[in-house]
Amino acid sequence: MANATIATLIEDFHATVLPAHLKRMVDRDLSLGTPFDPAPGNLVKVVVGMRRSGKTYRLFQQIRDLLNSGIKPEQICCFNFDDDRLRPFTASTIDEVLETFFELHPSSRSQGTFLFFDEIQEVPNWDIAARRIVDTEKITMYVTGSSSRMLSTDVATEFRGRSIAYELLPFSFREYARYHHVLEDRQGMFDKEQQSLLKRACRDYLVQGGFPGVQMLDDNERAGVLQSYAQFTVARDVVERHGFSNAAFARNLARVSLASSGRDFSISKIDGMSRSAGYSPGRATISAIIDAFEDAHLLHQVYEFTHSAQKVRLGGFKVYAEDPGLLCALAPATSDGLTRALETAVYLEMRRRASSRVGSIALLKHI
């Protein structure tokens, strides 16, 4: 028999939740590819990225596109597991959601269903239930999550080659301009006034960054919120997940790393500075923490170009923040701050366009 709370959440989505969000949604440029026709054994499409980067809204955009293509609303089940009314979760919670949906819309079992599970990692053993559903039901599944249990390396492990991961970064400059309605009705070439408007918008973007939730805040509010994003990511997705013993060191290392976005980065130098300050966990642990930052989508490491896969990590490297706004929120004001924010934005745009191959973006210091 249908769970009343689950049934209410399922029905409320199409009645009130989706219409309300569509009114203020800004289209993202990340493509999730052509939707698979519902069938057993489909690959799961997983949207990964840093917390607060807009993953849920990207699911809403996909749902809107499906509806516009002629898919019936009763063939779409979108469910957010981050709801206190669902707690405590059990091993059967995901099954209850699916069975309740089919009780509400029986024909969807044979016609095929598009499942959108948001924050699915809140449910214990979610991966076991998700794999079984994918193998046995006529469905197409989209999944997203933002906790330490839903990071990029976990996706490959949980679905074992049966998923496609899509990385969603905060707003690009194009998306930022779209959000702020900068020259959205432009046609033809830019005149001088339009060029000036774009230059001003670009400068603002490099300082404010592209996290959707901070776009309408003033400078002080935005800096505080962005700092909280970074601190919470370190606490949940790095310290808690990996069990690093010194949380204060990890927080400070995150601040130093993000503030160094676009600069040469040295593990040895960090180790030396830490020892001078009275504590260092050692180079190996520092390197492991930096890797954990990258896995949590807090920053990215870029190494010097080499033809040898074995030597990728032997040369120098730089780190780039997940968003130029993080650099400006965490770094002290310096003469090269805007320049490094621009370099960070360029790297992130290259990342949006590049393949996922190791070394597809590299440093070339000497020509």
Language-model regions: role of each:
Residues 1-36:
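N-terminal pre-Walker A segment at the start of P-loop NTPase domains
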Residues 2-8, 154-263:
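Interdomain motor-coupling "hinge/lid" segment immediately C-terminal to the ATP-binding subdomain
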Residues 47:
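Hydrophobic anchor at the beta1->P-loop junction of P-loop NTPases
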Residues 54:
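Conserved glycine(s) of the Walker
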Residues 58:
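Hydrophobic positions on the alpha1 helix immediately C-terminal to the Walker A/P-loop
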Residues 75, 219-367:
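Accessory nucleic acid-recognition modules appended to NTPase machines
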Residues 77-110:
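Short glycine-rich substrate-engagement loop in P-loop NTPases that contacts/grips substrate
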Residues 116, 140-146, 167:
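Structural recognition of the conserved hydrophobic beta-strand(s) that form the central parallel beta-sheet
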